[in-house]
Amino acid sequence: MRIKLIKTFTHNNKEYKELNFDFDKLTGQDLIDAEEITRRAGVNIAIGAADFSRSYVLSVAAKAASLPREALLNLSAQDFTNILNQTLIFLSGADSGTLEVNDKTA
């Protein structure tokens, strides 16, 4: 899944205008590893609540993007939130292509 960024950011002297998240490549071990990375970052995860921790979701997103989680922390707030939301959709088992957004703008 490619996500176009609202604001470009730089990591290791490379400028990114979009990021590719390959959620299909992730394994169960990757999710366990993401939980451990989150704990090492000092975030206490309650059993069963890991999927809802922003820090855990960030760790999963970073694994899917093959970037360190610290790099994603430098994204704009809008881009960061969008990426976390897309990662939550993945973690919930929903297909983002089947989700509908009801836009009722006046």
What are these regions (language model features)?
Residues M1-A106:
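Short, surface-exposed, charged amphipathic helix/loop patches that serve as local interaction elements
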